[in-house]
């Protein structure tokens, strides 16, 4: 899985990337205290990191690909310092409270976090890896952490992930505390391979802690 992910970034096969940021984040993100620590797993080079930091939060993304991490800072125009700790490379932005940790997410143990934003992590993982991801993620969060999860729903018989379709029953089994807050049709942001496969419905489901 890790090798495949790195290869996609090396080849520029990043059809899931939302260059303009995520609409659902801006519509549904809960208001938190300034300085709240927000965790963004498997963040890629998402501009959502910058948006969250601009709201006054301390944002930490975790990403396997160094190509993605360096691209984020270059595109955002933010200088950074680098530290290496425990096999992970910490890219610490010199503007805003914004850090991206480069390495294997399962080796990342910094905690606790006040909030979680997951748009591209759970849906990137095949079913057999999801429970381990969720267990590890929960270990990094405060017991009362606010959480926002975005899943995708589409006809997976026509095309497979990643990103994968994750159905509501599975979400509730993994995260009973999450409630579905709304849906957005995301045909404009649909990866090209799904459009080529003839998929006509592609929904982002937004889940929040109540």
For each predicted feature, which ranges?
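Class I (Rossmann-like) S-adenosyl-L-methionine-dependent methyltransferase catalytic domain
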Residues: 1-35, 45-48, 61-98, 102-109, ...
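Conserved acetyl-CoA-binding loop of GNAT-fold acetyltransferases
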Residues: 57
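A short, conserved alpha-helix within the catalytic core of class I
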Residues: 124-136
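Class I SAM-dependent methyltransferase "Motif I" SAM/SAH-binding loop
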Residues: 39-46, 121
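Short alpha-helical basic/polar micro-motif
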Residues: 50, 119
């Amino acid at each position: 899985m890790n090798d495949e992910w790195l290869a996609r970034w090396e080849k520029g096969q990043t059809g899931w990337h939302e260059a303009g940021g995520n609409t659902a984040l801006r519509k549904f993100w809960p208001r938190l205290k300034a300085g709240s620590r927000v965790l963004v797993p498997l963040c890629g080079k998402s501009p959502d990191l910058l948006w969250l930091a601009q709201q006054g939060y301390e944002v930490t993304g975790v990403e396997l690909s160094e190509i993605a991490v360096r691209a984020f800072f270059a595109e955002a125009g933010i200088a950074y310092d680098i530290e290496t700790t425990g096999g992970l490379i910490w890219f610490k932005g010199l503007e805003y409270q914004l850090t991206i940790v480069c390495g294997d997410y399962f080796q990342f143990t910094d905690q606790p976090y006040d909030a979680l934003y997951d748009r591209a992590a759970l849906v990137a993982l095949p079913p057999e890896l999801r429970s381990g991801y969720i267990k590890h993620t929960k270990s990094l969060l405060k017991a009362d952490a606010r959480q926002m999860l975005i899943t995708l729903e589409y006809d997976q018989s026509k095309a497979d992930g990643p990103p994968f379709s994750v159905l509501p029953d599975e979400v509730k089994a993994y995260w009973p505390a999450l409630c579905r807050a709304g849906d957005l049709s995301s045909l404009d942001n649909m990866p090209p391979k799904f459009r080529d496969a003839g998929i006509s419905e592609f929904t982002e489901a937004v889940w929040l802690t109540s």
